[in-house]
Amino acid sequence: MDKESYDYLVKIVLAGPSGTGKSCLLQRFVKNQWDDQVSHTVGIDFASRIISVGMGNQQKRIKLQIWDTAGQEKFRSVARNYYRGAAGAVLVYDVTNKDSFEELSSWLSDIRAMAPSTICVVLAGSKSDLQNQRQVSTEEAAEFCSEKHISSAHETSSYTGSNVEECFLSVVSTIITRIELGEIDPQDQSLGIQYGDLSFRRPVHPSSTSNWWTSITNWDDLVRLERQTRSYCC
C-alpha cells in the first residue's frame, strides 16, 4: 500500500487567543519537533499528516489537513473564513494564562457560527509542563466542556509532547465514529471530509455543490501555502 494513500481527507482548524501555543502544537503533532524561537502566525498557516485510527480490518488511514489560524484580533476576520467547511476544531488556551481561558467562549461562538453544525470540537490546554505557573484547573476546563457541549478536554505540552497525539486522535476518532454511524456524509464536501483513494468511492450527490475549499481562491493558493516557509508561535 502506498504510504501516501488514505481513506478520508479531513479538515481540522486550530483556534484560540494569540500566544496560546497553537503553532507549537501543530509543529509537535506534524513534525514531532519543538522550537522555542518561533513567531506569531500571520494570517493562516497550513500543514498535513496521515494517521491511522482503529484496529485490524477496521483500521482507517486519515489525512489531516490542519489550518493554524492567527489569534491576534486584527486577523480574526480572516481566521473566521477558514472555519467554513471544517470537520473538526481544536480550541486552544494556555493553562498558565487565565485570560486566554476566559476568551474561549468568544472563539467557540465564531467556530459554531461559521463551521458546519456537524463540527467536532475538542479543548486543548497548552503548556501543561509549567505546573508551577498554572492558572486554570482541570476541573474548570471540564466544566467548560460540559457547559459548551465540547466532546473532550486535553492538557497538552508541545515542549514534552504530552497528550498532543491524544488530542488530535480524539478529534479524528469522533469524526470517524460519526461517519460510521451515518451522522456525517463524506459525500457532502461542505462538512470538511472527502473520500480518499482507499475508500469505496460513490458518485457525489448532485446537490453537494458546496466545497470546503471555498476559502482558498484556487489550487495555486493551496500549493503556495504548502510550500511557504512556516512560522510557528509557542
From Swiss-Prot:
It comes from the Eukaryota. InterPro entries: P-loop_NTPase, Rab_GTPases_membrane_traffic, Small_GTP-bd, Small_GTPase. A motif (Effector region) lies at residues 39-47. A lipid is attached at residues 233-234 (S-geranylgeranyl cysteine). Keywords: Cell membrane, GTP-binding, Lipoprotein, Membrane, Nucleotide-binding, Prenylation, Protein transport, Transport. Gene3D superfamilies: P-loop containing nucleotide triphosphate hydrolases. It is found in: Cell membrane. Disulfide bonds: none annotated. It is a lipid-anchor. One of its GO terms (cellular component) is membrane. GTP binds at residues 16-23, 68-72. Its main location: membrane. One of its GO terms (biological process) is exocytosis. Pfam families: Ras. GO terms for molecular function: GTP binding; GTPase activity. Belongs to the small GTPase superfamily. Rab family. PANTHER family: DRAB11-RELATED. This is GTP-binding protein ypt4.
